[in-house]
Design a protein with these regions (language model features):
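FAD-site-proximal beta/loop scaffold in flavoenzymes
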Residues: 24-45, 118-121, 127-202
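Mid-to-C-terminal Rossmann-like scaffold of FAD/NAD(P)H-dependent oxidoreductases
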Residues: 176-258
Length: 258
C-alpha cells in the first residue's frame, strides 16, 4: 500500500516471563484486552481459586474485579512490595493493607518457580494450588514492524516531540514508543493513556503539515482499590514533604525549587 506519511501505533502486548511448566496450566490468561476479560469471565465460578502473578496495576485491578465472584484470590510478585513503580513503601503498605482486609492474599518477594498443572511452587519454597492463572507482570512495546523497517528502536520506537521516527515520513505514537519524561529528564516507554493520545495528536498534526509538539510527558496514574483512591504523578527524587493521617497519605517531592 503506497503512502505519503505513515503512523505506527502498534501499542503494547502482555509480557509473559519464562516459567517452567507454564504450558501445563489449562486455564491461563492475560488481563489486558476486553477479549482477555471475557475469556477469564467464562471460566470463573464461585469455587474458583485464582492465582495472579504480578502485583502491579493490572494484576491488582484484576484481583479487585473478581474477588467477590470466586473462592480465593492469591497474588504473588517478585518485587519486595506491591506497586513499586508508582508508590513508596508507605503508600504500598496502605494499599496492601486495604486489599488484604477485603480478602485478597498477597505474597511479595517471591514468584512462581515452576508449575505442575494447577500446582505452583514459588521461589520462596511455598506452594499454591489454584484453578485459574492470570499472568499480569507488565507489558512490552510492539516494536517489531518499526525494527524490521530499520527504525531506531530501544525498549520502544525512538521518536521526536512530533512523533517522527528515524525513517523519512514515518511517525509513531503511543505505547510502542519511548517518551521523554519531563519530571526526570529520562527517556523511556510510558504506557499510559494521556501520553498515548497526546503523542497521537502531535504526530497527526505533524503529518498534516502543522507544528504542535508534545514534549511535556509526565508519568501519572489515578486509580482506586475498594474505595481507597490514589493519584501519583512525576518522579520521586528530591526533598520530601509528607502529610500522613490514619487513612490519608500525601507526599510532595521538590527538586531544584520545583
Amino acid at each position: 500500500i503506497p503512502y505519503d506519511r505513515l503512523l505506527i501505533a502498534t501499542g503494547s502486548r502482555p509480557f509473559v516471563p519464562p516459567m517452567e511448566g507454564l504450558s501445563t496450566v489449562k486455564n491461563r490468561f492475560s488481563f489486558m484486552t476486553l477479549d482477555d476479560a471475557r475469556a477469564l469471565d467464562r471460566v470463573l465460578t464461585p469455587q474458583s481459586r485464582v492465582l495472579i502473578v504480578g502485583a502491579g496495576l493490572i494484576g491488582l485491578k484484576c484481583a479487585e474485579g473478581i474477588l467477590h465472584r470466586v473462592a480465593k484470590v492469591q497474588v504473588v510478585d517478585l518485587a519486595p512490595r506491591i506497586l513499586p513503580s508508582i508508590l513508596d513503601e508507605t503508600g504500598s503498605a496502605m494499599v496492601q493493607e486495604s486489599l488484604e482486609k477485603q480478602g485478597v492474599s498477597i505474597l511479595t518477594g517471591t514468584t512462581v518457580e515452576r508449575f505442575d498443572g494447577n500446582h505452583a511452587t514459588l521461589t520462596s519454597g511455598d506452594t499454591c494450588d489454584f484453578d485459574v492463572l492470570v499472568v499480569a507482570v507488565g507489558v512490552r512495546a510492539n516494536t517489531e514492524l518499526a525494527k524490521e523497517a530499520g527504525a531506531l528502536v530501544g525498549r520502544g520506537i525512538q521518536v521526536d516531540s512530533e512523533g517522527r521516527t528515524s525513517l523519512p515520513d514515518v511517525f509513531a505514537a503511543g505505547d510502542c514508543t519511548e517518551t521523554r519524561d519531563l519530571s526526570s529528564g529520562t527517556t523511556h516507554v510510558m504506557a499510559i493513556l494521556p501520553n498515548a493520545y497526546l503523542q497521537g495528536e502531535a504526530a497527526g498534526q505533524a503529518m498534516a503539515g502543522h507544528h504542535a509538539p508534545f514534549d511535556n510527558a509526565i508519568p501519572m496514574n489515578a486509580i482506586g482499590f475498594f474505595h481507597l483512591h490514589m493519584v501519583t504523578a512525576g518522579s520521586y527524587d528530591g526533598q520530601e514533604l509528607v502529610w500522613q493521617e490514619k487513612a490519608s497519605y500525601k507526599k510532595l517531592v521538590i527538586r531544584d525549587g520545583k
